[in-house]
Amino acid sequence: MHVVLAGGGTAGHIEPALALADALRRQDPTVGITALGTERGLETRLVPERGYDLALIPAVPLPRKPTPELITVPGRLRGTIKAAEQILERTKADAVVGFGGYVALPGYLAAKRLGVPIVIHEANARPGLANKIGSRYAAQVAVSTPDSKLRGARYIGIPLRRSIATLDRAAVRPEARAAFGLDPNLPTLLVSGGSQGARRLNEVVQQVAPYLQQAGIQILHAVGPKNEMPQVHQMPGMPPYIPVPYVDRMDLAYAAADMMLCRAGAMTVAELSAVGLPAAYVPLPIGNGEQRLNAQPVVKAGGGLLVDDAELTPEWVQGNVLPVLADPHRLYEMSRAASEFGRRDADDLLVGMVYEAIAARHR
């Protein structure tokens, strides 16, 4: 069996694809896996690092909304679809599993031409254009939110890295806090703005950090590799404020934390919900408002707070985040609400949907 994954561009498209690849290999170590990608996407680094085959096709960016530019897409897609067809034929693909992004639509259209079953996973609450189109031809459609508008969709959550899906935060906490140089007992705020949205969060956290420390809160702050590291003057006897350029073991960061201040990308929301980590979500104010939609269900369930980017200030953090961190019972209740909303088994559920699509083709 050979499965082609179509989900390049950003980590939000690539990580669920790689989680599925890992799950497929756990079930059948002999399964062939090829990921479609473009030269400009993160997949050029992430896919080979995980040991999977990467096949490149030309990038055809899709507009987020219907615009006059949309008319030019079919012409630009032709060569890309042909390249995708050649990859499907070369690998003798049994299924194409798409996650959105630049490479998804060419992958779907190539699969449709060749009669290869299509399985779609949509991570965002508001589906992207590629998955809207691809869902018309798909044998199976999986979504991350229970109220998705994609027809025939099955709610499974988002496939997660195994280190996240199996994380026991309480059991790993002593090791995690020691790894980051944190106090083993103090309430801990984790801060990360992701690859795109760190600057605003960085500014606010650097301003509010002394007030949090005075209140007995320690901070682990992933500043972002492209951002300037803050100058920290640690006062004796104060809880630590630890800025780092990047965290490559997010499972340890989640285990070390009691709460997180972060953006609301679909993958972030899914991971925090799965591990039961309460968060103050600050949706990135770009696109179609999908980040706000991503966070709303878990916030409504009681597992987080939600604040617009323009309203995020040091005063807001003091008035809203600090009271949560200072209240163990409220932290417990928010953690329980988040974990009840989260899903840890989406990778295995999606594997089942891939097998169903392949089996239906041969009936």
Swiss-Prot record:
Catalyzed reactions per annotation? di-trans,octa-cis-undecaprenyl diphospho-N-acetyl-alpha-D-muramoyl-L-alanyl-D-glutamyl-meso-2,6-diaminopimeloyl-D-alanyl-D-alanine + UDP-N-acetyl-alpha-D-glucosamine = di-trans,octa-cis-undecaprenyl diphospho-[N-acetyl-alpha-D-glucosaminyl-(1->4)]-N-acetyl-alpha-D-muramoyl-L-alanyl-D-glutamyl-meso-2,6-diaminopimeloyl-D-alanyl-D-alanine + UDP + H(+)
Q: Where in the cell is it found?
A: Cell membrane
Could you tell me which CDD domains the record lists for this protein? GT28_MurG
* Keyword tags: Cell cycle, Cell division, Cell membrane, Cell shape, Cell wall biogenesis/degradation, Glycosyltransferase, Membrane, Peptidoglycan synthesis, Transferase
Q: Which SUPFAM superfamilies match?
A: UDP-Glycosyltransferase/glycogen phosphorylase
- What pathway or pathways are given for this protein in its record? Cell wall biogenesis; peptidoglycan biosynthesis
Task: Report the function annotation for this chain.
Answer: Cell wall formation. Catalyzes the transfer of a GlcNAc subunit on undecaprenyl-pyrophosphoryl-MurNAc-pentapeptide (lipid intermediate I) to form undecaprenyl-pyrophosphoryl-MurNAc-(pentapeptide)GlcNAc (lipid intermediate II).
- PANTHER family registered for this protein in UniProt: GLYCOSYLTRANSFERASE, UDP-N-ACETYLGLUCOSAMINE--N-ACETYLMURAMYL-(PENTAPEPTIDE) PYROPHOSPHORYL-UNDECAPRENOL N-ACETYLGLUCOSAMINE TRANSFERASE 1
Would you tell me the protein name for this molecule?
UDP-N-acetylglucosamine--N-acetylmuramyl-(pentapeptide) pyrophosphoryl-undecaprenol N-acetylglucosamine transferase
Say which species the protein is native to. Answer: Streptomyces avermitilis (strain ATCC 31267 / DSM 46492 / JCM 5070 / NBRC 14893 / NCIMB 12804 / NRRL 8165 / MA-4680)
Gene expressing this chain: murG
